[in-house]
């Protein structure tokens, strides 16, 4: 699924009311009637297409026949569901474009989360309200732990790759990611999984770290990609963000098993409760807390790879709290989309987005 910011779209394309008003002012009589007839035919066509989609696609996409690693979908004898979730507290033309793009590419019918949310579920007041809406769905939707979940921000994420192709791509990406981790340790993938380490939750990436910080582990400790050295041309890594490595977690998109995602979202909300600081400027940023958990996971992985020691020079920068025992979870199976194979963020990528 290649994703773009809908801010590039011309609003006039979707502003039917304004366009109709101009027609009434400039073309009365026969022209107005013709416009109304065309508008009605357009609505009828759209309704017909939606009904056809509902008949043939039903509620959830069947992903049982898509090739996948056995640890991601536990049983090949049941039909795993695909959940397509869109956090959005209001309905507008951007949200409609996001939903339409998903339907056109045969994803399961999107579920809007947090619509008209109030109090602590009001995403207009705090982005972390999005996490509460996601948690509520993952705990109460009745889905199985090995169902596949896709979550996209409701105002700026457009699907462009068909669902079947995206699902196959996801499983391939996670299998390759597990193989790289196993190779780093000189073990097999099965042995890697026995240690509890694996990759299942794939988040989008940014070229810049946000919220910005020179000392926060989110911004300096997370791993670099394995992209070719000059992937962005001769200016790669020369200081301009548009030519830098895309390695920082972006919380706007994620794909992964429902069970793993549920545990991770629960952990993010627990972190918010434990570390809440009313005076912290970015206290309401869901991305801050999610990226903090990712940085701690990577910190512990590097320590485990090096006999309990962190291999890099800290040089006055902050590091996460080390794992404190069996009940202190640091491994959440989080990976990021270094290659833009799942999502293509627009920030700092204007030159490379067609």
Predicted region positions:
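Intrinsically disordered, low-complexity, Ser/Thr/Glu/Asp/Lys/Arg-enriched terminal regions and linkers
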Residues: 194-249
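N-terminal anchoring/stem segment of glycosyltransferases
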Residues: 29-148, 175-176, 183-184, 259
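Short coil/turn segments at secondary-structure boundaries
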Residues: 96-100, 114-115, 162-165, 215-217, ...
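Short, low-complexity, Lys/Arg-enriched N-terminal segments of secretory-pathway carbohydrate enzymes
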Residues: 1-39
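GT-A fold catalytic core of metal-dependent nucleotide-sugar glycosyltransferases
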Residues: 138-214
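Generic preference for well-ordered alpha-helical elements
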Residues: 92-96, 124-131, 156, 160-164, ...
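Catalytic core and acceptor-binding pocket of nucleotide-sugar-dependent glycosyltransferases
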Residues: 229-354
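A generic structural motif
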Residues: 110-120, 179-187, 203-205, 279-287, ...
């Amino acid at each position: 699924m290649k994703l773009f910011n809908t801010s590039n779209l011309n609003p006039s394309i979707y502003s039917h009311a304004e366009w109709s008003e101009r027609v009434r002012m400039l073309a009365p009589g026969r022209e107005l009637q013709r416009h109304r007839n065309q508008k009605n035919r357009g609505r009828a066509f759209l309704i017909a297409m939606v009904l056809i989609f509902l008949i043939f696609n039903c509620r959830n996409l069947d992903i049982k026949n898509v090739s996948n690693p056995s640890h991601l979908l536990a049983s090949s004898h049941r039909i795993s569901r695909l959940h397509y979730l869109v956090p959005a507290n209001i309905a507008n033309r951007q949200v409609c474009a996001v939903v339409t793009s998903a339907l056109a590419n045969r994803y399961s019918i999107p579920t809007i989360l947090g619509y008209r949310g109030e109090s602590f579920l009001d995403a207009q007041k705090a982005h972390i309200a999005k996490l509460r809406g996601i948690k509520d769905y993952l705990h109460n939707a009745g889905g199985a732990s090995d169902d596949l979940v896709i979550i996209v921000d409701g105002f700026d994420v457009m699907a462009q790759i068909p669902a079947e192709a995206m699902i196959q791509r996801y499983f391939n990406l996670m299998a390759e990611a597990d193989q790289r981790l196993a190779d780093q340790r000189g073990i097999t993938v099965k042995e890697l999984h026995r240690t509890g380490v694996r990759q299942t939750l794939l988040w989008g990436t940014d070229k810049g770290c946000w919220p910005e910080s020179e000392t926060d582990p989110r911004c300096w400790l997370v791993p670099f990609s394995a992209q070719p050295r000059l992937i962005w041309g001769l200016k790669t890594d020369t200081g301009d963000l548009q030519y830098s490595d895309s390695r920082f977690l972006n919380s706007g998109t994620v794909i992964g098993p429902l069970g793993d995602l549920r545990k991770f979202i629960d952990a993010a909300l627990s972190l918010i409760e434990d570390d809440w600081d009313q005076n912290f400027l970015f206290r309401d940023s869901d991305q801050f807390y999610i990226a903090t958990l990712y940085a701690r996971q990577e910190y512990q992985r590097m320590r485990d790879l090096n006999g309990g020691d962190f291999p890099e020079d800290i040089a006055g920068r902050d590091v996460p709290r080390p794992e404190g025992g069996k009940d202190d979870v640091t491994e959440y199976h989080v990976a990021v989309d270094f290659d833009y194979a799942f999502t293509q963020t627009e920030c700092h990528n204007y030159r490379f987005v067609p």
